[in-house]
Amino acid sequence: MKELKARYQTGEAQLKVKLQDHINNGGRISLTTDGWAGNNKLDYIAVTGHWQTKLGEHNSVLLDIIELTNPVHDGRYLCKKLLEVTNRLGITCAVMSVTRDNASPNDTMLEEFEAAVASQWGQMEEEDRLSFCCKFNRKDGDVRCCAHIYNIAVQAALKAIKSNPNEHRHHYQHEANRAILPDDERSAFFKIRSLAIIFKLRKLPRAQLKQMCTTLNIKFIDLMCDMPVRWNSTDNMLKAALRMEKPIRAVLMNQEWDQSVRRHLTPTDEDWDILKEMAVLFEIFRRPTVQSQAECYPTLRNTIPNYLHMIRQLNVWQSAVEKPTLKIAAGAAHNVLTEYFKKSMSTRHSFVSTICDPRYKLAVLAFLFDAEGGITSTNYKKGKAHFQHVYSQYSQRARGIAEYKRAQAERAVIDAQGSLSPSPEVEGQEDWRINPFHGFAEHMAQHQSVMPNVINTEIDRWLREPCISLDSTLDEQRAYMQSKAYDFPIISQMARDYGAIPATSAPSERVFSVAGNLIAKKRTKISSENVRYVLCLRSWGILVEADDEEEIIIDDNGQIVEQE
């Protein structure tokens, strides 16, 4: 681990060059950010960057991880830390979106960030202002992590049936022969959570469950107690319990190791029915959650279809009288998703990302909102208007840059001519300076015969172009967009920029999964500086993951020990 700091500085310099090349080619950067409290009792914020190259390559990289030294993590302070990263890398005015969780300080952070971007933009030279005219604004660039929203919806469903998980797992721990079932708990989930801890920590029950799984030829799965911040932990617990229902029933029916467990924590037939009803609800959220957290391909373009699909399924189940538990839970989840979906409809990013997808375009909105009137529906018209607005911004930027370069070239010619001896004047040579219709006759002769009867804009041509197959692979989608880059230059750029926006803050969360391994409970003295170096170098491919914990040795002062 020699010269760790020097390797970090070299890696950051290379990253900055890569980012600047992308920006100079007209590209924009999307960010994710999230906070984390480490085992070393320090708080951190991670910032990741995402973009697509002209070749369609999807880039996702850790930009920085910073220790939060201020005990009050308000929005202004978070914005200050975010700007430290973006200013140092020279990307502040190229940021188009920030994907974050729903914590209220993030609202202020993005408001402050928008103001900082506007201030920097106002101080730029004319050419740079033209290049960065599509600058960050919170209305269009604030992306709420949909995985967090899904979690809020599921937690609302669990709360509605009095089954939401307690923050403290010891709530479900029971001393031997002293197990109880609180009156305010819904028995099915309380019992399963309690059993998860019993089968995890008690040797005899665990051994009996494993043996019964072997006897019944059912794969043993660790039954892990869930946590409130991740609904999929509840889903995993529930799936494991239902897959091992027969072994669990058999063990609890015949066990003699704890009579209080037999009396209070053994699930009844009704309890198992409740768990199976809730498994139906979790199934609705499972695929969209997994899909939204991918890192190597676009995710935002599926947000609207997934929202509508979940809302419509929940709408069906909230009327299911024959499944009373599912009915209540689905109603609560439906209310949450509907509220957040309405908020998402007022922003442009999801619509633009969807319409730029060559498999979807506007056709998918006509399909999704068919019940509301299809192409005459309010949401279809809103989506089309959002797309046209963003196209207009990109088009104005392209025209502005082209006009600026033309004017600069013209000035250069004039300056060069002014420094030369005057040439003999040719009749009509300066006609273009005094005649506003100079060249019009030639233009008409060239174009009149092919002049269309209707306006044929790039948007019109894009929407008329047939959608490619819904089953097209990522490589096929990339190849298609590459082949159409000349025909649709503006929309191709929009597709690259909006296709890179992450639907969730999962990329930042993944950083902390790695950090959790680095800052182990027995290794809490590692300095924040070294945490930053190691995590960034891994993300940048300079420190490969094989150079893992065995090679990263920390001394008593929290410094990484260089190995022989």
Regions found by a protein language model. Give the residues of each.
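Short, hydrophobic/aliphatic alpha-helical segments
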Residues: Q20, R88, T214-I221, Y486-I501
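Extended, C-terminal/distal alpha-helical "rod" segments
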Residues: L63, E67-T69, M96, R138, ...
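Short amphipathic alpha-helical "interface-anchor" segments enriched in bulky aromatics
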Residues: Y150, W231-I248, M494-A520
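Conserved, non-catalytic sequence blocks in retroelement Pol enzymes and Pol-derived host proteins
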Residues: W36-N39, L68-G75, R100-D101, P228, ...
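Structured nucleic-acid-interacting core domains from mobile-element enzymes and related host factors
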Residues: M1-V61, G558, Q563-E564
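Mobile genetic element proteins and their domesticated derivatives, centered on retroelements
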Residues: D34, G49, L82, V98-D101, ...
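Polyampholytic, low-complexity intrinsically disordered segments
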Residues: S377, K384-I401, A407-R411, I519-E564
